[in-house]
Amino acid sequence: MATRIRLQRHGRKSYAFYSIVIADSRAPRDGKFIEKIGTYNPNTNPATVDLNFDAALAWVLKGAQPSDTVRNILSREGVYMKKHLLGGVAKGAFGEAEAEAKFEAWKNNKQSGLAALKAKQDEEKKAEAKARLEAEKKINEVKAKALAEKKAAEAAEKAAAEAPAEEATEAPAEEAAATEAAAE
């Protein structure tokens, strides 16, 4: 039986996540499978992979053929590196302890690279948020200044409108007083 390691789609439209399964190559994409060995969520940044490493390695050693995406996932997780090192042990190039040490060194190097990438992304997010906040502060200052100018103009206009009105009310009173004085 030709076995494949491939992805089985789950999730909703435009938000897919996948199960990594061992299936007969003739089975439909989301159909019957032999074993589920992990999950893959490409929606996160970086993509989240939860993999049963030992089961994946066992199936690769048995000769199961991965799909292109699964091959990239297995390579990134170190399954193919482990297979390569086990091949060296089988040929007698080095011992199993040395192979394990090389694998751990490779894994630590890979994880430190991922941690650096994550830290860089966090810094970029913080810088972007800070820049957005500064831009918003500038916009708010401009709006506040324009509003203050508008209120000052309205107050001046209101004061100017009240001054002639007061003069107008005082002027008829003075005229009335003048006419009363003239009448006496």
Swiss-Prot record:
SUPFAM superfamilies: Ribosomal protein S16 (SSF54565). GO terms for molecular function: structural constituent of ribosome. It comes from the Bacteria. InterPro entries: Ribosomal_bS16, Ribosomal_bS16_dom_sf. Residues 150-184 are annotated as: Disordered. Residues 174-184 have a biased composition (Low complexity). Residues 164-173 have a biased composition (Acidic residues). The keyword Protease does not apply. Keywords: Ribonucleoprotein, Ribosomal protein. Gene3D superfamilies: 3.30.1320.10. GO terms for cellular component: cytoplasm; small ribosomal subunit. Belongs to the bacterial ribosomal protein bS16 family. This is Small ribosomal subunit protein bS16.
